[in-house]
Structures are given as C-alpha cells and as structure tokens.
Amino acid sequence: QVLEKIDQDIMQGISVSKILEVMNHRIAVLYDREHTIGHAYFASLIEEPSVKKLAEIFKNSIIPLLQEYFYEDYEKIQLVLGDNAKSDNQYKFIVDRKLNVSEIFKGHIDVDIAEKDYKIQSQAFSLAQSYIEIYR
C-alpha cells in the first residue's frame, strides 16, 4: 500500500512499484531472493513525491546497496538498473567506456585487467525517463 500511495502521487509517469518489482526480479536472478530491495527505502516519497527525492534515494541508498550486493560488479548493476537497454546514454545511471589496455600500458601485458571503465552519471538521476526505462 505504501507503493500504491507513492505511485498515485509521484509525477512524470514514474511507477515506483514497477521499478521495485523489476529490479527485485533482476536481483533474484543475478544474485538471490534474500537480497531484494524493500519498499521502506522509498517511504520518504510519501511526504515528498518528487523526482528530486527519488534521485536522493537512488544516489544515497539504492546504488550503494547494489554496489555492496554485487561487489562493485558494475556490469551486473547496470543490468539491475536496465542501463544495458536504455534508449539513450543520458538515461543510464552507470555508463561504461571501453579501455584500450594495450595503449594504456604500451603493449602486451600478462595481468587480468578489466577492459571497461564505469562511472556513475549524476545527471541521469534528475531525469524521470531514467527511472521509467528501468521497467519499460
């Protein structure tokens, strides 16, 4: 019922209940059912139903929680957030870029190094579409 109240009040077409349902399903598939996100994280939206408040919740609670769950495996975090299928890069909470490892280290190296670099994209948190595209 908390989420129904929030869904009625929050503007710009964002469904917090759908966000939670889809993200929790993805977490259950990628990790387990014991580590899903509770609706209590979103309770403050009842008093202040706004994208600004939702952004605060994601930046300060949801993203750090996902970083902890997935040991900063940003590829999995991107999957939970739907960033792999967003219509435009501006809606991605986490963006990646390919690293040219041989260029960085000048030649062949025998060390296992990630070939992508990840960055949290602050401006995505203020865009309603970033949240809508988690579940669409």
Residue spans for each PLM region:
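C-terminal regulatory/interaction module of P-loop NTP-utilizing enzymes
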Residues: Q1-R136
